Amino acid sequence: MKKFALILEILQIKKSLSFEYTDSAYDAELARIRERFIPLVKICKEYGTAMRIGTNHGSLSDRIMSRYGDTALGMVESALEFLRICEEENYYNIVLSMKSSNTQVMVEAYRLLIVKMDAEQMNYPLHLGVTEAGEGEDGRIKSAVGIGTLLEDGIGDTVRVSLTEDPEFEIPVAKALVDRYTNRLEHAPIVDLSFEVKKNKSGLPYNPFEYSRRVSSAVKNVGGENVPRIIADFSKHDKITAANLFGVGYNYSVPLDKWNLTDQACDFIYLGKNKIDFAIPGTLSMIVDAANWRATDDYENTYPYFSSNEFISAKIKSTHLNFIGLTQKDIFENADVILKSIDKTCVLVLETKNTHAMAELRRIAIELMNRNVSNPFIVKRSYNSISSDELQLHASTDFGALLLDGFPDAIWIDAHTIASPQMINSLGFGILQAARTRISKTEYISCPSCGRTLFDLQETTAKIRSRTDHLKGIKIGIMGCIVNGPGEMADADYGYVGSGPGKITLYKGKVVVERSIEAEKAVDALINLIKEHGDWVEKELKFN
């Protein structure tokens, strides 16, 4: 506990040393930067060399932090300070990037950068990337949530996918993200926003520059203060058995005669016209087509799914929870009738078959928000005729973008012809985690290998993951070197950073805790550090 007390003391000292810059002190610091930066600008200008000005979310200066805080605005202003100096020297051969492993911050920063550049009549290309995205499924999902959201917005000129894997595995992911837009011009029409909203950015019913979840009224466990829910689609199964639930987070213990929930247990299962003839976990609810719901004998835990027309004409509805499918056509051709019929039991399922799916779902959500609809939203998207790898990226883009806008109270991925329920369920929870809207596992912020890397990143990441992957909600940064590591860990709770050949430095947040640990002992030292701070729990024993 002595080490823990020392860290707290260091944090208090750092806090007490922070101070507000006066305008004159701020300007003096800018002048110092200008003096040191201009020689580089002149050399680049002389030789026709391009420059990338990139802001790192975890490395903002004390001066920027004092005025703007650890925010997307701080990132943007930091880059603009250098950009203005370049323009004063008539140097314009520049690309900009906003680097963060936090997808919310990354997307906000790029959007805000464009607005700020427009205000100063600047127009520079943007390089997109989620820094230190990690490995495997998590790394691909996080990259797609961040990069894909901006590509959907029409933002971005170059792309870098940063994975803790061999470099050759990054290119196919980046290419798949970009290639999705090759034929996007063929999409079905989307109802345009009004001229007033376009001209007046504040006219949007949400703030695209700062994450805030849409305020909705709770219906049972959907919406309100509840975390976004996951709906598993079993409607295409020939017969549903207890074994089918194993893939969506429910394990049945024969010795204990009870269901056990994992941290990635789905919240609803959609049966369509199917039935279940066994006792399901008490925390799991069922959704069935409205016509089949009338014949059910479990009105307390089974809820109907209506089309909008079915709901308007229905004589029998659930007194607890009704799901209503809504399309763009429903909202823009029959909104008054539909919205008049909904009540406090209704959850709205926003659906589309448009190739440009995310934009249409966003447009439906905006229209409902402009009409002051407070019922919870579910976004539903069906996929077919693509590979499982493409599904991972496409779904992460479509759902991730809407989650970063703060819209959905639940997501519903229908991809039965492409992937297993287990993969789809894992994908759904991965998207929620990458968007930081529902945390169900440990998050690893790990860098790709480069010439500065001082240990085997893939091997070390695997070792750390095997020991810590049960620590839900903890963020661990695994960085190959001391050059970029501390900055790019950003908001990691713990850091494991290479500081020399065979040597590791451990961090608690951004504070160094221990230096020059032998690599063979470093993982154990990291575990001990986590334990000292009270964030450690033992892995649960699993009974079958």
Predicted region positions:
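Receiver (REC) domain switch/active-site residues of two-component response regulators
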Residues: 2, 156-157, 267, 408-409, ...
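Catalytic alpha/beta core domains of metabolic enzymes, predominantly
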Residues: 20-33, 64-222, 323, 330-471, ...
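Anion (oxyanion) recognition and catalysis
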Residues: 45, 369, 490
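Extended, intrinsically disordered, low-complexity segments
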Residues: 176-239, 265-268, 272, 286, ...
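Radical SAM enzyme core and accessory elements
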Residues: 251, 256-262, 495, 502, ...
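Nucleotide-binding motor/catalytic cores of P-loop/tubulin-like NTPases across gene-expression machines
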Residues: 482-488, 492-512
